[in-house]
Amino acid sequence: LREGGFSAGFTWDDFIQDLVSTEGTLTAVAEKLCAARKWEEDVGSVERALRRLRSRGQMAGGKWGSRTLAVFGLPGGVRARLRWMGAYHSRFTDLPVSVCQDLVRLWDHPPTTERREDRVWLALARTTIALRQNDFAAARTELERAEPDLTVAPEEARIEAALAHAFMASRTAPADVAALLERVPPLLLHVTGGEDRACLLARYIDQRAYALGTIDGGTQDGAAREKLYRQIPTKGAPPFALCRRANGLAYALWKQGRRQEAAAHAREAARHAGDGGHVRMRAMALAMLARIEQGPEAEDARVRATSIGQRLEDE
């Protein structure tokens, strides 16, 4: 819990200390802040304000907390941790639900919650936790509360929200899924991070494919799903995306009666999940293999998938 040199109990003192380490001295931090504010205040006054700010612990930072964050932002390691918790395709979701809840609580305070573009990731993390508990009402509440923050959030966060809305609709209002997923492609155009983009694309395609089985009585299943899953790129793709592709193909081929090919893809999905350390994805792949295969291998896969789910506290 000390990635980037910060404990989970990140405080204003930690924030100021990071700025001092970067700029050299507290005076240098104050000078940079003064310059950004067009010298509305003198350096001495700002330096004293920063000394008061670093004693605020995890309380609201007031005007100087807001001003300092506006100029410098949170440290890169802290921002990365918040994004990690908010991304469904990260290994945050491979932790037991109770551990995920503890981690979110440990970061859910100032200074990490002072800016909208930072705290939105905590809302997304809480949404994922609620979905893992099959608590759609709580997930919707989190997303509704996050709407104002999403307007200034990066594209990745807005895609996360759109995919969460579409996932819930696929279980409760299938006719709404297509419109919800239409929000994703324009946002994906602006996602430049290779691994994040690959995972988000794989999740988008996966949800489009799932929707095919919920409309017209499922008549658009099988071959149409296979065509979609084959659109997920494989060259240089991270294990998460490769697992989603293989598991999706396993189901699509199984629906077409191609059981041996389907089982091979399910085994491939389990292998990719293991390579990436994605425990939940491995459970899904094993569950798929249990549906496709017969006999001892199917029973073994079913038992292993169930055991993983219990250990992760998934509903």
Regions found by a protein language model. Give the residues of each.
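Recognition helix of helix-turn-helix/homeodomain-like DNA-binding domains
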Residues: 34-60
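A structural signal for repeat-array scaffolds
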Residues: 76-85, 89, 106-114
